[in-house]
């Protein structure tokens, strides 16, 4: 994997994690 692919994968992981936290927070967890 090159640095561009690693950057995109890490960005998607962080983005998905942030969305999950927002959803859980609004669910009242």
Curated annotation (Swiss-Prot):
Self-association state and partner proteins as the record states: The 4 large subunits of the cytochrome b6-f complex are cytochrome b6, subunit IV (17 kDa polypeptide, PetD), cytochrome f and the Rieske protein, while the 4 small subunits are PetG, PetL, PetM and PetN. The complex functions as a dimer.
Any S-S bridges, and between which cysteines? Answer: none
Q: What is this protein called?
A: Cytochrome b6-f complex subunit 8
GO function terms (MF aspect): electron transporter, transferring electrons within cytochrome b6/f complex of photosystem II activity
Q: How does it sit in the membrane?
A: Single-pass membrane protein
Please indicate which superkingdom the organism of origin belongs to. Answer: Eukaryota
- Alphabetized UniProt keyword annotations: Chloroplast, Electron transport, Membrane, Photosynthesis, Plastid, Thylakoid, Transmembrane, Transmembrane helix, Transport
Q: Which GO terms describe its cellular component?
A: chloroplast thylakoid membrane; cytochrome b6f complex
Question: Which GO terms are recorded in the biological process aspect for this UniProt protein?
Answer: cytochrome complex assembly; photosynthesis
Any idea where this protein resides? Plastid, Chloroplast thylakoid membrane
């Amino acid at each position: 994997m090159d640095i561009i692919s690693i950057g995109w994968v890490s960005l998607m992981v962080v983005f998905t994690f942030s969305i999950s936290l927002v959803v859980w927070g609004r669910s009242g967890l």
